[in-house]
């Protein structure tokens, strides 16, 4: 439990109802949603606006108390949960969504606004959010900015960094930085917005975000293609990227993952037999364009002899069913146990080799494990999920990440570094790059108040 002095200071800022010190109430903030990462919080503070965030950080900074910013707690690398006695700064009450600028396609939202809610507001105004993911009903915009989240539409719109026009954030000492509203073009000095995007709450606490929206494309066509393996999926995916202007998503999964989804959710299989690999393709267009989308997709797939079977869906219910085979992977994996979740990117020409090599390597280091891979094929991004090894067996993670580094890949495509991949980052990044990162951390948070031990190793400058 926090000291009386700090508790009193925090209560004076946000009120007693929003300083949580009861262990049972804190529990939901102390464990990530996979159940793999957990710790104990000094207390949980729930500010409702930027002035309260400023007050909380000033109070914590005054006594050198470490702070862990937390959004929807849907992260997968342990970056948003306490490690041992930090103050958890929950941003869920900063959920305001301003009216959409319907003429220019922009909106300002609070860091605690949930993606699904922002998307609904945007669509009502004829616009959409360029990033989407299965956790849309719990993931917050602030958390997505802090991890530079990706998702299923990166192939079309890019990651979260591409959607952010400006942001407002608070440094560890309570200083407010950033610009709201942001501008489409602004080359005045260093790109602070770009720096804070993807910084995992280690440099500042994001409080508001100015998003650039994309046109809402209501007509969708989804195809699920059965293939002989990842090599064929890459061939087909490359052809579709060249020929389909309407391409909206390009996702890959495998027979073992589909079997697990069916086993855990009861979802029937899409074809009358199993195939080694599956490519889910979505095309999108403006109203009354479904027929054109179907024709274009059918024509493009017709030029791909690698496709062994296809299911095509136009109506919403059928589209959702095909998407369920991909999106329910995470649900099925979590239902089967506490997974090791690794999120990596490989050069396209190394993906096939990696997919084979990672399974072989895991057979060596964790012979009784169950390996499920799926991912965003258009970005070279695979999610490697390992079931079976104990949650604290980081040798399993290490084996995969060493393989990724050896093949010229990235150990984090969209989930961030957190605590889970910190050692791998220190091992695989250039020493000069790490030195530059540490210099930035020292400049913006010299006392290591914000998320110590996340992304970079802590020097132990703060109290917990």
Task: Enumerate the language-model features and the residues they cover.
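FAD-binding subdomain of flavoenzyme oxidoreductases
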Residues: 96-251, 450
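N-terminal accessory segments
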Residues: 1-33, 63-65, 300-318, 406-411, ...
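C-terminal substrate-recognition/cap domain of FAD-linked oxidoreductases
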Residues: 22-29, 211-215, 221-399, 403, ...
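Active-site cofactor/substrate anionic-group-binding motifs, chiefly glycine-
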Residues: 64-69, 74-79
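Activity-critical C-terminal alpha-helical subdomain
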Residues: 175, 422-464
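N-terminal flexible segment immediately upstream of the FAD-binding catalytic core
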Residues: 1-58, 75-105, 257-268, 315-343, ...
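Short, ordered loop/turn segments at secondary-structure junctions
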Residues: 24, 71-74, 94, 134, ...
């Amino acid at each position: 439990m926090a000291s009386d002095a700090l508790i009193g200071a925090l209560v004076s800022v946000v009120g007693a109802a929003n300083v949580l010190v009861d262990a049972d109430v804190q529990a939901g903030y102390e464990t990530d949603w996979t159940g793999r990462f957990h710790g104990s919080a000094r207390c949980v503070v729930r500010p409702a606006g930027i002035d309260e965030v400023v007050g909380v950080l000033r109070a914590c900074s005054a006594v050198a108390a470490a702070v862990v910013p937390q959004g929807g707690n849907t992260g997968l690398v342990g970056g948003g949960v306490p490690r041992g006695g930090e103050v958890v700064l929950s941003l869920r009450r900063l959920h305001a969504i301003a009216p959409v600028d319907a003429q220019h396609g922009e909106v300002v939202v609070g860091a605690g606004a949930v993606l699904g809610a922002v998307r609904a507001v945007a669509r009502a105004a004829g616009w959409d959010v360029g990033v989407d993911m299965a956790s849309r009903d719990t993931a917050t915009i602030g958390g997505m900015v802090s991890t530079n989240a990706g998702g299923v539409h990166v192939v079309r719109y890019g990651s979260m960094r591409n959607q952010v026009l400006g942001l407002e954030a608070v440094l560890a000492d309570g200083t407010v930085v950033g610009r709201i509203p942001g501008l489409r073009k602004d080359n005045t000095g260093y790109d602070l917005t770009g720096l804070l995007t993807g910084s995992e709450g280690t440099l500042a606490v994001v409080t508001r975000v100015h998003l650039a929206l994309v046109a809402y494309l209501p007509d969708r066509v989804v195809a699920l293609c059965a293939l002989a393996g990842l090599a064929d999926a890459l061939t087909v995916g490359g052809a579709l990227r060249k020929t389909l202007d309407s391409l909206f998503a390009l996702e890959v999964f495998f027979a073992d993952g589909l079997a697990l989804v069916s086993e855990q959710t009861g979802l029937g299989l899409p074809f009358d037999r199993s195939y080694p690999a599956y490519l889910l393709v979505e095309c999108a267009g403006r109203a009354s364009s479904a027929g054109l989308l179907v024709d274009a997709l059918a024509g493009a797939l017709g030029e791909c002899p690698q496709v062994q079977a296809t299911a095509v869906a136009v109506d919403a219910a059928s589209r959702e069913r095909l998407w369920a085979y991909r999106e329910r992977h995470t649900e099925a994996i979590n239902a089967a146990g506490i997974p090791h979740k690794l999120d990596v990117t490989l050069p396209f020409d190394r993906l096939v080799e990696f997919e084979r090599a990672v399974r072989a390597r895991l057979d060596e280091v964790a012979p009784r494990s169950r390996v499920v891979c799926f991912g965003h094929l258009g970005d070279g991004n695979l999610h490697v999920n390992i079931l079976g090894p104990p949650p604290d067996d980081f040798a399993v993670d290490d084996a995969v990440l060493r393989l990724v580094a050896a093949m010229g890949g990235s150990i984090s495509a969209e989930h961030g570094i957190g605590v889970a991949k910190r050692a791998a980052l220190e091992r695989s990044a250039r020493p000069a790059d790490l030195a530059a990162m540490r210099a930035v951390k020292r400049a913006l948070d010299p006392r290591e108040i914000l998320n110590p031990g996340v992304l970079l190793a802590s020097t132990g400058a703060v109290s917990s």
